[in-house]
Amino acid sequence: MRHVTGELAASHAAPLFYQSWRPEDEPRAVLILIHGFGEHGGRYNYLVDYLVPRGVAVYALDLYGHGCSPGKRGGLSEWEQYVQDADALVNLVKREEPNLPRFIMGHSMGGLIVASYLLDHQAGLNGAVLSAPLLEEANVSPLIKTAMKLLNRVTPGLSLSTSLDAGAISREPAEVLRYQQDSLNHDKASVRLGNEMLRMAPEVHRRAGKIVLPLLIYHGEGDQLVPISGSRRLADEVGSTDCTFVAYPGGYHELHNDLDRATVLADLYEWLERHL
């Protein structure tokens, strides 16, 4: 396996950190990966170790304010910056792997980013994968939403702790500990980022009929961080005639780091194979 790191010119003045993993032989396809909130592109080692030896190259960036990329942790000016950053990574892959089938995948907040990206950018992609996409907020009261909107007008850059429950990412204690000990992870979100997430999920549902490319959506039924109902709803709303929705019984939020990851990764690879 060949591992490369680099800098990606995107929507910000400072470049973003990205990395790629390629098989020793020529790959048969490439997966473009957008990570979730508070984490980074280097946390997908099980996925990389499964797909790359089977001929699927993986490219991942660290979003602005995340991982090894610059920016205030959890900071964001507007959602379109995430969309532009995803597009920058897609365009990099088009330049570096011009003849390979291309798939884009997003997990959690990254799933929301990819879903919003697909509303206007599907050309040149063979399909998309959404892993536990953040398409419905968990127990956010109307009072909190109103307070967030008011704060967004006054102090959009204010960072707040999300108090993310690391124990909800996986049923494996070792994976929870690994998450907690990873210094590149954080639980900070700016008021603007929180508002943008609350704004974009309904927008994706409203315009979901525009998503017509092959789509795989999967979610754990035991996910305590992102409700599975948003994924079920999107699967019914998209315009694609080739949409697969899979619910994994008991699965926690990070299915690629959970107890049944071997099954999840095998299912992912099989879906990619069918769409080459």
Model-predicted segments: where are they?
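Short beta-strand/loop motif that positions the catalytic acidic residue
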Residues: 211, 217-219, 223
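Short alpha-helix in the alpha/beta-hydrolase fold that links the catalytic acid
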Residues: 213, 227-236
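Catalytic active-site module of serine/aspartate enzymes centered on a nucleophile-bearing elbow/loop
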Residues: 244-276
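Conserved alpha/beta-hydrolase
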Residues: 48-72
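Catalytic nucleophile-loop/oxyanion-hole region of alpha/beta-hydrolase
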Residues: 38-40, 67-97, 264
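N-terminal cap/lid segment of alpha/beta-hydrolase-fold proteins
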Residues: 1-25
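Short beta-strand element of the alpha/beta-hydrolase
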Residues: 28-36
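Alpha/beta-hydrolase fold nucleophile elbow
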Residues: 97-107
